[in-house]
Amino acid sequence: MDGLLTSNAKKAQELLKEAGYDGTPVVLMHSTDLKVLTNLAPVAKSLMEKAGFKVDMQSMDWQSVVARRAKKDPPNAGGWNAFLTAWVAADVMNPVSTAYLNAACEKALFGWPCDAQLEKLRDDFAREVDPAKQKAIAEAVQLRAIETTPEIPVGEYVQPVAMRKNVKGFVIAPAPVFWNIELTK
C-alpha cells in the first residue's frame, strides 16, 4: 500500500476540478477543548485549502461537536461536512471494530457512508477464520476505504504513560486498564 496516501496538492486540485466542485464552503467542525484534537482541524483546514476547497472552520467545544455531528441538516442549515476525532488502538484493530469503516448507510456512524462492497468485505473478514485470508481481506477493506473515504486516517501517536516507582502491576495495553495495580512502600 506504499504511496497510496502520499500528499499531492496539485493532483488533489485537478481531481476536485474534475469532480465539479463549485466552491461551496466545506464546514469543518473544530474541537477546541480536547488537547488531542485541538490542533488537528487547523492542519486539516490548511491541507483542504491547498487541495482547492473553501473551508469554513467553526470552533466549538467537544460537546457541541458531538451534538452537531448527529445532525443530517445541510451545512448551511446547521449541519456539517467534516470533523476530526481520535480512537484508541483497541477501537481500530480490525475492519469490524473500526466504527468509521461501517458503511451501512443509515445504520452507519456520523456521515452515514453507504457502500455495499465495503460492508461485504467487512462481513467477509468477520466470517473468515484463516488469519492469512483475513489479512488479505483487511487489505481489500483498506483499499476500498481509500476509494470511498468513509474516514480519512491522518496519523497515529503514542500516548505517554508515567507512574511513580511505588506503583506496581500496571498493565500496558491499547487502552488504560486499572486492575492488578498496587502501591508498594
Describe the role of every protein-language-model region.
Residues M1-K10, K71-N76, S97-R127, E156-K185:
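Short, solvent-exposed loop/beta-turn-alpha elements that line the ligand-binding surface or hinge
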Residues A19-K35, N76-A86, V129-K165:
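Bilobed periplasmic-binding protein-like "clamshell/Venus-flytrap" ligand-binding domains
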Residues L47-N102, I137-A138:
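Periplasmic binding protein-like
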Residues V36-N39, A67-R68, V92-P95, M163-K165:
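Extracytoplasmic/secreted cell-surface and envelope-processing proteins
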Residues L28, M48, R69, A99, ...:
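Hydrophobic, well-ordered secondary-structure elements that form the walls
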Residues A9, Q13-T24, V65-G78:
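Accessory recognition modules or surfaces
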Residues K10, T38-A51:
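Short, polar/charged alpha-helical segment
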